[in-house]
UniProtKB/Swiss-Prot annotation:
Location in or out of the cell: Cell membrane
Family: Belongs to the OST-beta family.
GO cellular component: a single term: plasma membrane
Tissue: Expressed in liver.
Positions annotated as glycosylated: N42, N48
Alphabetically ordered keywords of this record: Cell membrane, Glycoprotein, Membrane, Signal, Transmembrane, Transmembrane helix, Transport
Topology feature Extracellular, residues: 21-64
Official protein name in the record: Organic solute transporter subunit beta
Predominant location category: membrane
Task performed by this protein: Essential component of the Ost-alpha/Ost-beta complex, a heterodimer that acts as the intestinal basolateral transporter responsible for bile acid export from enterocytes into portal blood. Efficiently transports the major species of bile acids. May modulate slc51a glycosylation, membrane trafficking and stability activities. Able to transport taurocholate, estrone sulfate, digoxin, and prostaglandin E(2), but not p-aminohippurate or S-dinitrophenyl glutathione.
Organism ancestry: Eukaryota, Metazoa, Chordata, Craniata, Vertebrata
Cytoplasmic-side positions: 86-182
Length: 182
């Protein structure tokens, strides 16, 4: 950064040295006419020399630079979109690898839970207790079985949940039908 500051400071000093006197100060006004005429001649000479310098270094048409910067902007925009596309593709493949790896982990976890359940079943001494635990699990009944075993009053509407209670009765989980009024 200090190199950039040195460069800018050098350019500033160079501009100050090359700048010609273009305005009259109060000191030149108070001088006699003879010295003013001499200074005017010197100033016109300086103007002629700066004009000669300007002619030796003519100003270029800035449209070339404008087109170059415009082309550079399009190249940078293209590169930015290219990097964005590569980044999204890399993220997608990383997610797919993570999902495939997680699927393998889930299979091993399922195997370990099955082994733990088998050990638990082996540890249970009383078979009657095991049978009682298995019977207390909720059972799921399809709608066809419910329609065959129960009266026509129990047919469910859309969105209603049928439950078989421990006493053997089949009924709806929610008896409140506030949505029917709407």
């Amino acid at each position: 950064m200090s190199g950039l500051l040195k460069y800018l400071f050098g350019c500033f000093i160079l501009c100050l040295l090359l700048q010609g006197k273009t305005h009259m100060t109060s000191a030149t006004i108070s001088k006699p006419h003879e010295t003013i005429d001499i200074e005017k001649q010197n100033m016109t000479g300086e103007r002629n020399s700066t004009l000669a310098q300007q002619l030796s270094f003519p100003m270029e048409d800035p449209t070339n630079w404008n087109y170059a910067i415009l082309a550079l902007a399009f190249v940078v925009l293209f590169l930015a979109f290219l990097i964005l596309a590569q980044n999204s593709r890399a993220n997608r493949t990383r997610k797919m690898k993570a999902l495939n790896g997680a699927g393998g982990r889930n299979e091993t976890e399922a195997d370990s839970t099955q082994k733990a359940m088998m050990q638990y079943v082996v540890e249970v001494d009383n078979l009657a207790e095991t049978d009682q635990m298995l019977q207390s699990k909720p059972t799921y009944i399809s709608l066809n079985q419910v329609a065959q075993t129960s009266s026509p009053k129990v047919l469910p509407k859309e969105g209603q949940i049928l439950v078989e209670w421990k006493d053997g009765n089949i009924g709806f989980l929610y008896t409140d039908s506030k949505e029917d009024d709407v």
